[in-house]
Amino acid sequence: MRCVTSFVVLCILMFLVVNNVKVDVKAQRRKPVCKLTGVLNPGKCPTAIHDASNLCSRKLASPNMTFKRCDCQNTEWRGKDHYQCTCYIKLPCNQ
C-alpha cells in the first residue's frame, strides 16, 4: 500500500513540475511588443523590403519615436490597392 501511495504522490509531483516548467518557457518566448499601425494609404508597397521599411518609417515618423522595424502590407479595399504600415517601437514604449 505504501508503494502505491508513493507512486501516486510521485506522479502528482512530476505533473506539477512539468506543468510549471512549460508555463515558464511560454512566458519567456513571448516578449512585449510595442507596435504602431498606420492607416490605409492608396498604392502598393515597394517590392524591396528595405524600401518598404523606409517608406513606412517616413509615413509614421515623429520626432520622439525611433522604430526598430517597420513592415508594409498590401491590402485591397473597395476594389483598389492600398498598403498599411506597422512599425515596432524600441522598448520602453512610453518614451
UniProtKB/Swiss-Prot annotation:
Primary subcellular site in the record, as a coarse category: secreted
Disulfide bridge partners, by residue number: 34-93, 45-72, 56-85, 70-87
Biological processes, Gene Ontology terms: defense response to fungus; killing of cells of another organism; signal transduction
Localization per Swiss-Prot or TrEMBL: Secreted
InterPro entries: SCRL
Signal sequence bounds: 1-27
Keyword Secreted: yes
Entry superkingdom: Eukaryota
GO cellular component, one term: extracellular region
Keyword annotations: Antimicrobial, Disulfide bond, Fungicide, Plant defense, Secreted, Signal
Family note: Belongs to the DEFL family.
Alphabetized PANTHER family for the sequence: DEFENSIN-LIKE PROTEIN 241-RELATED, DEFENSIN-LIKE PROTEIN 245-RELATED
Protein name (record): Putative defensin-like protein 252
Native source species: Arabidopsis thaliana
